[in-house]
Design a protein with these regions (language model features):
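Short beta-strand->loop micro-motif that forms the acidic, two-metal-ion catalytic signature
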Residues: 43-46
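Catalytic core of pol beta-like nucleotidyltransferases
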Residues: 1-24, 32-38, 49-136
Length: 136
């Protein structure tokens, strides 16, 4: 369930008006939480049907800053490392969803990828622990 944040509607409207193919929008970080402070930025991640070019992310972040009066950290989910994506999926809020199946499939894929990463890391860390050194 999404907790309503006073700037969610403005953020959603701005993003969906400026970019096509938006499947989901996530708010994460301290904004909208008990940890939010007046100087907190707003962390937003978008899931689009395509990878969004960097210049469009920068332009949209600037537009959002003007509209909200707050610093905005805008990210394309498809360009983020799995360690950040899993935090967004598990701890963030999906504030907009135009393609529920696509968003849930992406979230599930992210969680599966993170589990695989941890399994691989476990073997590496176990090997380091047994050898008591990282190199050679």
């Amino acid at each position: 369930m999404t907790k309503k944040y006073h700037l969610d509607s403005l953020i959603i409207e701005t993003i969906t008006t400026k970019l096509s193919g938006i499947q989901a929008i996530y708010r994460y970080g301290s904004a909208g939480s008990i940890y939010e402070r007046p100087e907190s930025d707003i962390d937003i991640a978008i899931l689009a049907a395509h990878i969004v070019p960097y210049y469009k992310i920068i332009n949209l972040a600037s537009t959002l800053m003007g509209a909200t009066g707050r610093d905005i950290d805008l990210q394309d989910m498809q360009k983020l490392p799995v360690t950040l994506r899993v935090q967004i999926v598990l701890q963030g809020e999906r504030i907009y969803c135009a393609a529920r199946v696509a968003a849930e499939t992406y979230d599930s894929h992210t969680l599966s990828e993170y589990v695989r990463l941890n399994e691989e890391r476990h073997l590496i860390l176990k090997d380091i622990q047994q050898r008591e050194r990282i190199y050679g």
